Structures are given as structure tokens and as C-alpha cells.
Amino acid sequence: MELRALLLCPDARSAQLLGEILAEQGIAVDQASDSATALESVATRRFDALILDADDEERAKEILSKARLSALNSGTLVVALVASTSNVRQFFSMGANFVLYKPLSGERARVSLKAARALMRREPRRAPRIPVHAPAGIAYA
């Protein structure tokens, strides 16, 4: 199973750079053109990573909180793209795992996403294991 990331970034240059870096690391990218599309995708599909541009902080927080509340994406790794003047504590408190500062540098983004990739290791089983409790006995013949 391949890893999949949802990318919401209105800046075409940054989106292209991130898409190339993710593709180099073997991560398939679903690019959302707007926050409504991203909200719909988060509600209906499972992603291994969400990469959200935080220029519109309210919409980014809405997507992040919806992901954290959904059964599909509650444990999904989140990377927030923020301006250097943004309050990153809010994003970390809402569950963001990584922050990339804009404007993006290719090398800095590559190193950060490589570190994030290590945390995205997918469960090799199709479904998680569920504990089962049943009475059992041992008989010696």
C-alpha cells in the first residue's frame, strides 16, 4: 500500500515544490484546490499526511480539527505551512506535527518532509488487530 498525502496550498510554486518532494519519497499526492474540497476529502478518505497552508488560519484550523475528530484521519500526520509571523503554538496545540515556514526553501522542505516520512510508516496489515477475549481450556491427553 502506498502512502497518500493531501496537499492544500494555493501558491502554485510551493505546491509544485512540495509535490515533487513528496513524489521523490514515494508518497502519492492528492491536491485540493480549495478548503471546501479539502474538508470533503478529509471526511471521506484516509490520508497518511495532511499538508495545510495556514494563510487562512481559520480554514486551516477547521480542516485540522475535522481531521483530528474523524475516525479516518485522527492519527494522520499534519504539516502546517506558516508565515514567519504566525503563532505556531495554536497549530501545535491543535495537533500539527510539523511546521514549515514560508517562503519554502527546497532543501529545508526536503529535510523536514524526510523526517515526517519516517513517522508515516503504514501498518502492514489491511486492518488493525482487535483484541479478542474468549474462554479457553487445556486438556492433557
Where do the PLM segments sit?
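Conserved phosphotransfer microenvironments
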Residues: 15, 34-39, 47-74, 82-87
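Alpha2 helix of the CheY-like receiver
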Residues: 39-40, 110
